[in-house]
């Protein structure tokens, strides 16, 4: 990525028994560095529904997008990672 290119957006996907707030200590400093960040908030109904919600979230941020998934969120980003706007995925 050259200095003329914009930074990727980052979409965080939480694991079971968690919510998007678990990423707050990461989001604040990343936003301070100029990254657009959003924590997807899904209801853990079915994986297909959660993937659909993350794909909709990808549509709300600037491209390209980096998906970050923790635990169950890794399954979700695997499903959502087929979107053409996804530049990479991080599993934690």
How should each PLM-predicted stretch be described?
Residues 3-5, 80-85:
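Short, conserved loop/helix-junction motifs that constitute active-site signature segments
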Residues 62, 77-79:
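Generic preference for hydrophobic/aromatic residues in regular secondary structure cores
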Residues 85-92:
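A conserved short beta-strand
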Residues 25, 79-80:
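Active-site signature of alpha/beta-hydrolase-fold catalytic machinery across serine-
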Residues 5-62:
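Active-site catalytic motif of lipid deacylating hydrolases and related acyltransferases
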Residues 68-73, 77:
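Gly/Ala-rich beta-loop-alpha elbow adjacent to hydrolase catalytic centers
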């Amino acid at each position: 990525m050259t200095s003329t290119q914009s930074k990727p957006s980052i979409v965080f996907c939480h694991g079971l028994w968690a919510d998007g707030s678990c990423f707050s200590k990461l989001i604040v400093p990343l936003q301070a560095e100029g990254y657009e960040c959003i924590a997807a908030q899904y209801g853990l109904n079915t994986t297909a529904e959660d993937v659909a919600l993350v794909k909709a979230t990808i549509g709300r941020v600037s491209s390209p997008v980096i998906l970050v998934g923790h635990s169950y969120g890794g399954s979700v980003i695997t499903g959502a990672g087929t979107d053409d706007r996804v530049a990479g995925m991080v599993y934690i």
